[in-house]
Design a protein with these regions (language model features):
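Structured, non-catalytic alpha/beta "coupling" segments that mediate domain-domain communication
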Residues: 82-132
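N-terminal non-globular leader segments, chiefly Sec-dependent signal peptides
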Residues: 1-14
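P-loop NTPase catalytic core of nucleic-acid-dependent motor ATPases
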Residues: 34-57, 110-178
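Phosphate-interacting basic helix/loop segments used at nucleotide- and nucleic-acid interfaces
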Residues: 14-33, 155-161
């Protein structure tokens, strides 16, 4: 469950019968699943990927999934007509509520993303604030082509400097070096 919303219901009076609406109610709080930057959506945590996403469509799909799950769990308990107010349905007005929530009601609350290299074999958690993962692992291996290229292009001393700089980036020390 996303920590910045709760699924709510309300009853609307119709001419002939009551309609139960299921909708997302956005909570004003410092969220660990949602980031707001510059007065707008910045990123959302996607648990299945183990990464943050800066694509707002991912946020809308996660909210819609929560709505659908709630409906599926509770559908036997409702009497009358049930209407789920999905984010994808512009006529429901929920997308406008979402934009109002992100742009007007919430204050900036974010961490910079992708300040650390994440390799394919890296364990990632939410606090790594990563939205991208490299497609290859960081592990020892043969680098014959790299060695040949570097020894052709650079002297041993220059190569050492370049590899030192690359190493400082990979280990994260480059942020502390002046």
């Amino acid at each position: 469950m996303l920590d910045f919303l709760m699924i709510s219901t309300r009853t609307k009076q119709s001419k002939k019968k009551d309609i139960i609406e299921i909708y997302p109610k956005f909570i004003i709080k410092k969220s660990s699943d949602l980031m707001i930057r510059g007065g707008d959506f910045y990123a959302i945590w996607i648990e299945e990927r183990g990464l943050w996403s800066t694509d707002e469509q991912d946020a809308l799909q996660l909210i819609d999934r929560e709505l659908k799950n709630y409906y599926e769990e509770k559908k036997g308990t409702f009497e009358g007509t049930v209407r789920v107010l999905y984010m994808w349905d512009a006529e429901s007005g929920m997308i406008d509520s979402w934009h109002k929530y992100c742009q007007k009601q919430m204050r900036d609350s974010f961490h910079m993303l992708d300040e650390k290299l994440i390799f394919s074999n890296s364990k990632v958690n939410k606090r790594d604030y990563a939205s991208k993962r490299l497609s290859y692992p960081l592990e020892p291996g043969e680098t014959q082509a790299y060695d040949k290229l570097m020894s052709t292009l650079y002297s041993e001393e220059e190569r050492h400097k370049i590899e030192w700089a690359i190493g400082s980036i990979v280990t994260g020390d480059s942020k502390k070096i002046q």
